[in-house]
Amino acid sequence: MALCLRARREGDPGELIVLKVADLDAAVRLAGRRGLPALGEETTFGDRRLVRLDPAAAGGLNLALVAGDGPGLSAPAVSEASAVSALDHVVIAARSGDRALALWGARLGLDLRLDRSNPAWGARQMFFACGGLVMEVVLRLGEAETTDRPDDFNGLAWRAADADAVQGRLAGLGFNVSEVRNGRKPGTRIFTLREGVPFTPTVVLQQNAGTAGAEP
């Protein structure tokens, strides 16, 4: 299973998190048996078949399953150092740890790689492997957990070989970007795109260790 994402557009209920599967019909049947039923009729995602899942069974998130891998998007020609190389991780703000574990682990079958609480950050973080990237699910410590409130899509982190080079290129193109700063994880560098990505909190992350994903 791998992941792609369609950013929210005007009039949309929210970002659509799309999970790519080898056998769409089998994946839809399995999701339904696990309490994650399809929502409405089959549609398309580009030239591929797509089935939305019921947000009421997914903590309020807009999820879908799509068939096959399909071609990627073409990228502009830029130097390797100043290029964004891949999506590193997707961040979800959750309201209930048990609900998040049930959705991403039990129902969707993603591999839980790490579950930790960090009082200094005021957060519990769960990291699920999804293809070549990571789903980071965050709960705020000190807040009562509830299933009465929906979970939220909370942003994207893109991977780059040289955060300073990418920040300089984007600033030169007129994007409103922050200064590059050290990340929370040792050996990382990060900056924020303040504007230019509608509705979507976005950061660019340099992993000096060269590993894929924010956490093992």
What residues fall within each predicted segment?
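Vicinal oxygen chelate
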Residues: 1-84, 86-96, 117-136, 146-171, ...
